[in-house]
Amino acid sequence: MERNMAGKLFSLRNVALLALSLSAASAYAVDVTVAYQTSAEPAKVAQAENSFAKRSGATVDWRKFDSGSSVLRALASGDVQIGNIGSSPLAVAASQKLPIEVFLIASQLGSSEALVVKNDIKSPQDLIGKRIAVPFISTTHYSLLASLKHWGIKPEQVKILNLQPPAIAAAWQRGDIDGAYVWAPVVNELAKQGKVLTDSAQVGEWGSPTLDVWVVRKDFAEKHPDVVTAFAASALQAQKAYLAAPEQWLKDPSHLSTLARLSGVPEAQVPELVKGNRYLPVADQVAQLGQPVDKAIRDTAEFLKQQGKIPQVDSDYSAYVTDRFVKQVQAAPQS
């Protein structure tokens, strides 16, 4: 009888402890909405495998956006806590004092973003008077303006139209535009019927490099630093496998199908797009998330001010960049 009673008390105690642990887990659970775009990068494997949620214990809602400007609006409203944007919208956000900070570099952009034009445009000078579409306040907008400056063409000599990528694809098919500076998957569709006049790798060599970055709302980062660190860790871990053996990684059918699905491009085009950008391991992330990214924001802001896109340029943008989360990843045993 005493053994039965002791057994019952033991069982009740276990049930109580289990209930308390479940209650604590529920209280700790964090809801986070992540804004992603359609770039084809190795870290998207982490998204597909849900490794961020597994590492953090958070409930994650991944939402696809067509451009950085739309991501900024979602970040500003609080609908999104973590978002993927380019260095141009980042400069705009910092100039507008949006309370966000860069915590991870997704990629240094190269041939994955390009200016594609109709085949009758033979040289940059043929752009004068033509209709060129681009999503305003995007990395490609910045790269287009930088290209025109390099070629000695004033922006007002070209009819620059503000269109989102899906609208660019439709306008191209209708014959409403003569070209567009855009990214995957639309850039791939345009290139089937047109030709690449320049790309962001070339523009970077001309002195106007661009980045894709991950940013987080500062209030969310302060409340949930472990969640942000888990995001950085999951992305860098997925990327690490690619950097260790790029060609072998790109031969894995599961990688190709994952990136094709999340980026909207055919599997056959994935390798070229992935190789078109540069991805930074954790040590390089730590080195870049400081003065280099601060300078990139400032240089971009200065250019955008010259073009009349923002009213002023600050002398210091370090408040919008942090390396503390990638340093946590670097310090962890698994890194």
Question: What do these predicted regions represent?
Answer:
Residues 222-309:
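Secondary-structure end/capping motifs
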Residues 88, 161, 167-262:
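Pocket-lining segment of extracytoplasmic ligand-binding domains
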Residues 294-335:
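Conserved C-terminal helix/tail region of periplasmic/extracytoplasmic solute-binding proteins
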Residues 23-29:
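Sec/Tat signal peptide C-region and signal peptidase I cleavage site
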Residues 16-17, 27:
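Cleavable N-terminal signal peptides
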Residues 54-57, 202-206, 282-291:
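Short, solvent-exposed loop/beta-turn-alpha elements that line the ligand-binding surface or hinge
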Residues 2-16:
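Bacterial N-terminal signal peptides that target proteins for export
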Residues 30-162, 178-184, 195, 200, ...:
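Short, glycine-/small- and polar/acidic-enriched structural segments
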